[in-house]
């Protein structure tokens, strides 16, 4: 791990402890090797998209090719490790949701509530970074099948900010 573990701030120290603990627990679903937190430049090279970002990368990379992005603030994984095919499906699922959001002029949280209702999942389960290829295909299909005029009217409750 490249980041310093010793720190003055108690909160930051706790975050680092959680990261180290989490890092030990992450295993690749493809080859069962451990995954480690690495600079994104390992995978992407010295590109603008890699600057200051981190990934959890299978320790057998590049042979295995499984990785997942880390949250910028907490450095916890954004989902499960994914190979190239699954990463591509997740990108397509995010694009489908974004298109539905734009077509319906919805907030992001509204789109996710719509998706939760359609998939019968709760908020903790509705993260594309956790989805399999099958679930990503379901998201894409639901978004493509949703008539814009209907899907825009499916969720009309007040926002959590209004409550």
Question: Each predicted region: which residue ranges?
Answer:
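Positively charged, polyanion-binding regions of nucleic-acid-associated proteins
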Residues: 89-104
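Short metal-coordination and nucleic-acid-contact micro-motifs, chiefly zinc-binding Cys/His arrays
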Residues: 21-27, 51-54
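Short recognition patches in nucleic-acid-associated and regulatory proteins
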Residues: 33-48
